Structures are given as structure tokens and as C-alpha cells.
Amino acid sequence: MKDIPVYRFPAEHARENGELELYRASNKASAACKEAIEKAISEHYCDNVLHREAVAQVAEQFGHERILYVLAITIRQKDWDGRFSADNKQWAKAVPVAENPDAWGTDRNCYLAVNSHSGLVDLFTKLAREDARAHERRPSVLVRLKSRPPEAAAEGVKKAKEPSL
């Protein structure tokens, strides 16, 4: 589900623009991501420690963008909950999430809110944000090699062959 893009517009926008299939696929992936986060927290919380493997497990399946989107929705939906850190609340407010009202005025995003203990969701959010930043900063070796000009790459090879005294 990593390849399904996050659709950030409400259902009405999708309907008006002929993008209902994209909206539904994204919403389905986000709901599955929510469930995967709940499962990962349950499986990786032991001895009062939430292990980083929880984030890695979900990121492998859904990618960081969707995880962070679902977590931002969760924190916004539970803004009243003091167990979320001020830092995570501020971050969640900065993530672009459109209100998605149904025919009765209920925000459909409430169905994407993670239902694990808020303190653990806060910790999972902190770990997920750190993990996402770490992955942003580390370009692959292939990307780094492709971005180097040919002269610099050849220069690096020459230097490696020269014996040092």
C-alpha cells in the first residue's frame, strides 16, 4: 500500500473532480495504516518501552507520509487530550489535513484516528517523526553517486589509488 498516494482532499472535492477512486483507495489505505499502527503499538510495547521496530514495521508497509498523515489526524481529533505533547500537537496542526464532513456534518477523519492509549500514540508519533527525518536526510548511495559530477567521481577514484606516505 506504499504506492497509493495520500489523497488530502475531502470526499466532496473528489466527487466534483472525478477522483472518487483515488479518494477511496487512499482512505482504505489510511484505515489499514491506522489498524497497523494499533497492532504495532500492541506488539512492540513491552516493559514500559515502545520499541522503534513498531515504526519500522508500519513504515515498511505504508511509508512515512501516510503514517504521519494518520498520526496528524489522530492528534487533531484528540486535541483535548493532555497526554499528547505540545510539540506533537503543534506539529499535527501544521500538517495539511482537510476537514471531511459527511452528510450529517461528522468529520470522516474521525474514523482514521488511532484508538491506542494516547500516551503510546504520542510516543509512536515522536518515533515516527524522528524516523521520517532520518530517512529524508539519508539519500541512497546510488542517488549520491548520480548527483556527483563525473569529474568529481573520477577525482575520487584517482585519490584512492595514490599511495600515501
Question: Language-model features: where?
Answer:
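Gram-negative host-targeted secretion-system effectors, predominantly Type III and Type IV
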Residues: M1-S164
